[in-house]
Amino acid sequence: MQIPKGKKIYFASDNHLGAPTKEASLPREKKFVAWLDEIKQDAAVIFLVGDLFDFWFEYKTVVPKGFTRTLGKLAEISDSGIPIHFFVGNHDLWMNGYFEEELNIPVYNKPKEFTFNNKTFFIGHGDGLGPHDKGYKRMKKVFTNPVFKWLFRWMHPDIGVGIAQYLSVKNKLISGDDDAKFLGEENEWLVQYAKAKLENKHRDYFIFGHRHLPMEINLGQDSQYINLGDWIQYYTYGVFDGEKLELKVYNEA
């Protein structure tokens, strides 16, 4: 795909809307919606790269209460003809058709490659990738198991959502201290994952979230690893202008 002149591609991840409570996250949600409202002026494509919500589970006829401003703005942008792509994260992996049916937004459960202006973008949330994160990999197999999802669906939403919110805060899954530290290239497992991928095929950009830490790391071979940071502490996003990709900080006007 060639980006029209004057248009850009935007990337954001790790909003964790609803954490630690819906009331506490409302200012962050309003800031994110203001950003969406600004970028729609020149956006060719928008990528939401996981953990938009701190918890999301779609029942057969019910979705979580709240997030009206975000969902309404996404619907408006999608209806205007601007493509939006959504990658599930480890907090909102239980998508089941709502975004596709109501918002016309495709949802991806694993990394996917795109090409814009002859540059390749390898995009994913980042959870469970690379040589580490073994505990989460085991946990993800349980969470994505059809039997587990069926059993959870039979739990009353007030109970299920309450348990999920408690565990998220209790285990500091939002923005714990470990996520705020750069571990060095040799210990950043998403960097190692990207380098391993480069051994088989060249990509210009590897774009991930999950780490809650903005990073721009050159991998050699004219390839770059980008971590998008988050919308909890950093309010960072990626933007590709047709020639180069860079991280920026959103400062609301």
Where are these regions (language model features)?
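N-terminal short leaders/motifs
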Residues: 54-77, 176-203
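Core catalytic region of metal-dependent phosphoesterases/phosphodiesterases
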Residues: 2-8, 12, 17-116, 233
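Conserved beta-sheet core of the metallophosphoesterase superfamily
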Residues: 106-109, 122, 127, 133-139, ...
